[in-house]
Amino acid sequence: MANTTESAKDRVVIFDTTLRDGEQCPGATMTLDEKLAVAELLDAMGVDIIEAGFPIASNGDFEAVSEIARRTKRATIAGLARAIPADIARAGEAVRHAKAGRIHTFVSTSAIHLAHQMRKTQDEVIEIILKTVTQARDLVEDVEWSAMDATRTDIDYLCRCVEAAIRSGATTINLPDTVGYATPQEYGAMFRQVRERVPNSDKAIFSVHCHNDLGLAVANSLAGLEGGARQIECTVNGIGERAGNAALEEIVMAIRTRADVMPYDTGIDTTMLTRASKLVSHAANFPVQYNKAIVGRNAFAHESGIHQDGMLKHSETYEIMTPASVGLSKTSLVMGKHSGRAAFKSKLAELGISLSDNQFQDVFERFKDLADRKKHVYDEDIEALVDEKLATAHDRIKLLSLSVIAGTRGPQRATMKIEMDGRTFTEEADGNGPVDAVFNAIHEIVPHDAVLELYQVHAVTEGTDAQAEVSVRLKAGERSVTARGADPDTLVASAKAYLSALNKLSAASVRLHAQHAAVV
């Protein structure tokens, strides 16, 4: 990559697929409100294209894509579709209210996929490309075509497919490393060959889409840029199937930090990266690893004495970017029980959080309640309150009260009161430990067949009065959901997380009914 001046920078299109590919990882199901919150933040931070879902997959996905298309102000909204007429028609319908809509259609091209998944000949797949891309272009002006498993596709055949897609009206050509197999050298070379050999390649933008199975997703994406691609498909925090996707925040900050060798501009407001990371982490219920590049808790932490000495003398001795450049503030101890509405609203604005009047009122009341129980309320506490409000806005099952008897002798006992579908239920149950008793009490009120697959606890902030954040993953049949709950009381946080998971199962059409004998 050659050095260049600022004025010569190429524009790289950022295509975010957090709400589609990111949500495909097990347990990452988001509610409609959570998807809307993520989409609105992505739109505000400057993401060019938001792939909002797979409209044919379910009514919920169709509704999410349609609603996001109506709500977003500047981003192009894309709907995914297989190379099937019904899929393409459904995607077109879902994005028709967008300021700018895109249909993203795909078909397998590798020999192994054609033989064992598609069971089609190469010529038959070419015909499918011609027909389905033409259909999509009749519905929208902006059509993206993807060659599924491109990196394991014969290069001669890949060029034939790309030429056919562009000839049929595709405006973007995506060559994904679907199984995370390629190396950066191979991936960049593939783009150079295709662009050189396909006669109409100048009529489309080329796109990268990399999976992280070998830990090369970001490196491969950047190599694709060097090969001539000008769109990068990525997800916040790198969430996605298997080992995940290329991480948006890593892509953007790599380009910004190494502008000397990567002369590109992404148009992203990088000061919103940390907030986006936290929002997606909570909505998808996937914690960010502490040593995650850019947005991990330790990304700007220095413990080594030599490093600390250098940082105190000059920050650039060990930091290649500033915390402020990704939205991290050095101040956090400013809110308490005496803070009023104006101060709280100002703090939300500082954190990049926008709420409706009703949402603000509810979160402010929760903040005052928390401030009465905690000496200091940190930014992370406020973010947890907001995220919990967004996640539970339309819950069928809500926790009203919980008391637990625990000690070194005898069984632990939990007494719980919940509201479900507007009715109040009370039950008590024993357990082998207080958490077991809490979960047993929930099961007494809401019988279900879901299996607990994960239970984790960590502190949101420091100190003995810190809020506990509990993660719970439940599996019912083939459906797996993950949910979180936060509270200074670990047992209350556990109950909130478990009930939130049940609410997600309910939203996914898993049948849940309260025991009528417990009605009070």
UniProtKB/Swiss-Prot annotation:
GO molecular function: 2-isopropylmalate synthase activity; acetyl-CoA C-acetyltransferase activity; manganese ion binding
Catalytic activity reported: 3-methyl-2-oxobutanoate + acetyl-CoA + H2O = (2S)-2-isopropylmalate + CoA + H(+)
Residues that coordinate or bind Mn(2+): 21, 209, 211, 245
Any one Pfam family match given in the protein's UniProt record, by short name: HMGL-like
Cofactor(s) this protein requires: Mn(2+)
Main location: cytoplasm
EC number from the UniProt entry: 2.3.3.13
Keyword Disulfide bond: no
Keyword Kinase part of the UniProt annotation: no
Limits of the Pyruvate carboxyltransferase domain: 12-274
Region (Regulatory domain): 398-520
GO cellular-component term (any): cytosol
Pathway field: Amino-acid biosynthesis; L-leucine biosynthesis; L-leucine from 3-methyl-2-oxobutanoate: step 1/4
Protein origin, superkingdom: Bacteria
Keywords, ordered alphabetically: Amino-acid biosynthesis, Branched-chain amino acid biosynthesis, Cytoplasm, Leucine biosynthesis, Manganese, Metal-binding, Transferase
Subcellular locations according to the entry: Cytoplasm
InterPro entries according to UniProt: 2-IPM_HCS-like (IPR050073), 2-isopropylmalate_synth_dimer (IPR013709), AIPM/Hcit_synth_CS (IPR002034), Aldolase_TIM (IPR013785), LeuA/HCS_post-cat (IPR054691), LeuA_allosteric_dom_sf (IPR036230), LeuA_bact_synth (IPR005671), PYR_CT (IPR000891)
One GO-annotated biological process of the protein: L-leucine biosynthetic process
Family, similarity comment: Belongs to the alpha-IPM synthase/homocitrate synthase family. LeuA type 1 subfamily.
Function: Catalyzes the condensation of the acetyl group of acetyl-CoA with 3-methyl-2-oxobutanoate (2-ketoisovalerate) to form 3-carboxy-3-hydroxy-4-methylpentanoate (2-isopropylmalate).
Subunit organization: Homodimer.
Designated name of the protein: 2-isopropylmalate synthase
Native organism: Methylorubrum populi (strain ATCC BAA-705 / NCIMB 13946 / BJ001) (Methylobacterium populi)
Gene: leuA
